[in-house]
């Protein structure tokens, strides 16, 4: 799962970093740009991790999983009863 998420993230970050400065900005040296890549990747990873954890916690605390489970149980029981009456 981590590899599945990390590869697209790495591609996006590298594209953003290697895109270059805007025309109004001074051109930084390549070595300083390449030296900042690891810290930018770490910062981006930490931000992404925090947002993912917050989303998971929000889902855990909501009643959506319980409602979904109840709906599937009720639907399954209805189908089971209909099959019982149809084949008996």
Curated annotation (Swiss-Prot):
One Pfam family of this chain: ApoC-I
Gene Ontology BP annotations: lipid transport; lipoprotein metabolic process; negative regulation of cholesterol transport; negative regulation of lipid catabolic process; negative regulation of very-low-density lipoprotein particle clearance; triglyceride metabolic process; very-low-density lipoprotein particle clearance
Keywords: Lipid transport, Secreted, Signal, Transport, VLDL
Location of this chain's protein in the cell: Secreted
Cleaved signal peptide residues: 1-26
GO CC term, one of those recorded: very-low-density lipoprotein particle
Gene Ontology MF terms: fatty acid binding; phospholipase inhibitor activity
Chief location of this protein within or outside the cell: secreted
InterPro entries cross-referenced by the UniProt entry: ApoC-1_sf, ApoC-I
Purpose: Inhibitor of lipoprotein binding to the low density lipoprotein (LDL) receptor, LDL receptor-related protein, and very low density lipoprotein (VLDL) receptor. Associates with high density lipoproteins (HDL) and the triacylglycerol-rich lipoproteins in the plasma and makes up about 10% of the protein of the VLDL and 2% of that of HDL. Appears to interfere directly with fatty acid uptake and is also the major plasma inhibitor of cholesteryl ester transfer protein (CETP). Binds free fatty acids and reduces their intracellular esterification.
The family this protein is said to belong to: Belongs to the apolipoprotein C1 family.
Protein's UniProt name: Apolipoprotein C-I
Gene: APOC1
